[in-house]
Amino acid sequence: MIIGTRGSQLALAQAETVARLLKAKGVETSLKIIKTSGDRFTDRPLHAVSSGVGAFVRELDEVMLEGKIDIAVHSMKDMPTIRPPTLPTVAVLKRDTPFDLLLTYDGTPLDELSEQSIIGTSSLRRAAQIKRYRPDLVTQDLRGNIDTRLRKLKEGKYDGILLAKAGLERMGWELEGEILSPDFFCPSPNQGTIAVVTRAETEAEAAVSRLDHTDSRIATEIERILISELGGGCTTPIGSYAEIMPDRKKLHVRAEVLSLDGEETVGINEFIPMAGGIEKARELGSSLVHMGGKKLADEALMQLSRDSCDSNDLHE
């Protein structure tokens, strides 16, 4: 079976993880690298690449529908909420660390960084959360693979950079940094999770379904439901995180929408029962909308649309 993947080091590491798990189940695979729009246009912010929605996913969907690959491997946080019905997410792998990590030039923690320190990130959510937590800091866009980002930090172009902890774990890199609390830095929905997609009703679907991790699927589904009515795609300042409690009777759920400047926030932070958790998550998602979350998300999209037009003018 052919596994389609992006060509970055991280994407290849994730695809190789899936290949290894399938081989343990007796399924032989090969990798096929697909270049996505998110990979091609690294000279502009991610939100300026086809509005950022599905920038790392769309081309893999297309080649799968054409029958050129059997399996696609994604960072689940990059996947749009609305998916083609013929391309189900057949397996959600066991989740890695879902939190953000701050790496600083000289090891200084976030609370001790000097005013006007420059923080690099490609995520509008992380940028907004930093502005809310430390409005005296400066955020700048940071694109490129993990190697490139770390090199720019070492060169002193940034005082700190924000990354997903899971990405470093999958690369096998142990770097000392500060894990940011989800109470202040609610992660992107499904962060730290690998999703595996196939065409429906195929041999690949049957094989891949054996890799599904039930608890991770439950948590990621709750996270998507919480923010499903907000719109905005995976690039707007939206966080969502669901954690199954040790007693397995409750989930701790957090979700928030921020303005791009971090000055406004609408959020929830509650415990909900596992039984009926899907319906309760829908209720909380509706509450986010009525509290003004949809308005904030729409305003962010409008601003991003204007910025994208300006950016595209520069690249014509």
Curated annotation (Swiss-Prot):
<dbReference type="Pfam" id="PF03900">
    <property type="entry name" value="Porphobil_deamC"/>
</dbReference>
<protein>
    <recommendedName>
        <fullName>Probable porphobilinogen deaminase</fullName>
        <ecNumber>2.5.1.61</ecNumber>
    </recommendedName>
</protein>
<dbReference type="InterPro" id="IPR036803">
    <property type="entry name" value="Porphobilinogen_deaminase_C_sf"/>
</dbReference>
<feature type="modified residue" description="S-(dipyrrolylmethanemethyl)cysteine">
    <location>
        <position position="234"/>
    </location>
</feature>
<dbReference type="Pfam" id="PF01379">
    <property type="entry name" value="Porphobil_deam"/>
</dbReference>
<dbReference type="InterPro" id="IPR000860">
    <property type="entry name" value="HemC"/>
</dbReference>
<dbReference type="InterPro" id="IPR022417">
    <property type="entry name" value="Porphobilin_deaminase_N"/>
</dbReference>
<keyword id="KW-0627">Porphyrin biosynthesis</keyword>
<dbReference type="GO" id="GO:0004418">
    <property type="term" value="F:hydroxymethylbilane synthase activity"/>
</dbReference>
<dbReference type="InterPro" id="IPR022418">
    <property type="entry name" value="Porphobilinogen_deaminase_C"/>
</dbReference>
<comment type="function">
    <text>Tetrapolymerization of the monopyrrole PBG into the hydroxymethylbilane pre-uroporphyrinogen in several discrete steps.</text>
</comment>
<comment type="pathway">
    <text>Porphyrin-containing compound metabolism; protoporphyrin-IX biosynthesis; coproporphyrinogen-III from 5-aminolevulinate: step 2/4.</text>
</comment>
<comment type="similarity">
    <text>Belongs to the HMBS family.</text>
</comment>
<dbReference type="GO" id="GO:0005737">
    <property type="term" value="C:cytoplasm"/>
</dbReference>
<dbReference type="GO" id="GO:0006782">
    <property type="term" value="P:protoporphyrinogen IX biosynthetic process"/>
</dbReference>
<keyword id="KW-0808">Transferase</keyword>
<dbReference type="InterPro" id="IPR022419">
    <property type="entry name" value="Porphobilin_deaminase_cofac_BS"/>
</dbReference>
